[in-house]
Amino acid sequence: MPPRNDRPSDRNVPRKSAVREARNASSRPKAFYWLLGAIVLVGVAALSYVAIRPKGGPTDVIQTADTTNAGPSQGYLMGKVDAPVKILEFADFECPSCAGFSVVTEPDVRTRIIDTGLASITYFDFPLTQHRNTLAASNAAACADEQGKFWPMHDRLFQAQDEWNGEATDSPKPFFKRYAQEVGLDVAKWESCYDARKYQKRIGANLADGLRRGVNSTPSFVIGNKLYRGMASYDAMKAIVDSIAKSTSSPLVNGAPAAVPTKTK
């Protein structure tokens, strides 16, 4: 999700100009008090916005989906099944940092890591209770997967997170239904699946898998059996993938890495 334009310098522009106006208005007491009131209102509004706006860091976990008897996890694969490096992403569709990774970083990851065969990425649901509409979003994406369209729906959900999240609406389904049409789904079949909450156990199993792996915030990534928390940059992820690929690609001779021949002069 693109960052909000809430830089202190932007918020302070009207405040500073109002102060200058007030200082020059000593001969106009009515104007002075009007401007003073405006300053107070601007300050209150700015503080309120800072207090309620989504934070950019990882979102702490609170268990949501039912993980009882959930069975084995089943994520959503992108890339080759036999890719040398496996990236497991545990994310929440309503998590701002997850949207940031999807919109800002993941396009490069896909074209320069996944599409080139260096690694695969598998998405696992990790819904959080403080996000009111996230289970519904996971359900919408799972039903899109039934028609082979998980990733287009995944992308659309993150791109449009601002309009369907729990702070924006109590009824996300109309938005999801529109996205289903936009990504080319049979909307009637998708809606039947969505209304039945057909994949709730799958979502719960994915959450349970993350908990077993020690995931406690979103987004989190498991790469080479190591857990990384927070929104990763492309460069950081590429370095990890390259390191794992290098450590596993050396040929073995009698169980030991083969000697690397040196150039002769």
Over which residues does each language-model region extend?
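C-terminal cap of thioredoxin/glutaredoxin-like
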Residues: P2-A51, E106, K177-K265
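Short leucine-rich amphipathic alpha-helices used at interfaces
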Residues: E21, P54-K55, E167-A168
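Ser/Thr/Pro/Gly-rich low-complexity linker/stalk segments immediately outside membranes or between
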Residues: P54-T67
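A short beta-strand-turn-helix
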Residues: T68-V85, I113
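Residue-level signal for pocket-adjacent positions within structured domains
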Residues: G71-S73, Q159, I223
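Residue-level detector of conserved, well-ordered beta-strand and adjacent loop positions
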Residues: G79, L88, R229
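Structural alpha/beta surface segment adjacent to cysteine/selenocysteine redox centers
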Residues: A83, L88-Q181, R213, P251-T262
